[in-house]
Amino acid sequence: MYDAPDHVGLIPDGMRRWANLNGGDLTDAYVKGAHKVTDILVTLQRLGVRTVSVYNLSRANLSRRDEELDAVYAASEVFFTTLIPARFDPAVCTVRLHGDRKSLPAGYLAAAQGAETAFQGHGFTINVLAAYDAYDEVQNAHVRAQELGCDINDAFEIGHVEMVIRTSPEQLLSGFLPMQCQYAHLLFLTTPLNELETDQVEYLVANYRRFPQLHGK
């Protein structure tokens, strides 16, 4: 057996489809999804993963209908203010928001910044990508590299990703951390997020550990 992935990317997807198929309220579907994301984070931490980057919203997603965005924002605020504090130790866990903060509503930003302030541990990192755009990330890394006098590869705030889980069968990264995912093990699930169980996550990590990760070598 090889090591568990150090850094997992999570692309929660399919809440709108799930709500339509189950005749449910969109906000309720996203809140249920937030609970599932939290369960996945707890499981990954238990399995030895040290960092998880969660794709909450791309900048392109901000063009969606207000009804859809309001549901995402409401669920995200529950995630930051209730679910994370209930399941993680602030002395162990770090929460970081990545993306264009100026494009996010005040309530969302306050909830995220509250979690960032409260959670500053060094054992497990939760990166949340919101209003994120890869072009912005590269440009920001370029500026940071010039300021620090370092190589641009050392100026990215988020490191290399070993495994990506998307909770839909569409084989797309949708702009998720393209520089960091160059050699990531990509998993596209047929099980919707709101029906995903932790034993399935355990299986995915166990299967990853069966093979050496050569990263092009």
Question: Each predicted region: which residue ranges?
Answer:
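Flexible, compositionally biased loop and terminal segments
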Residues: M1-K217
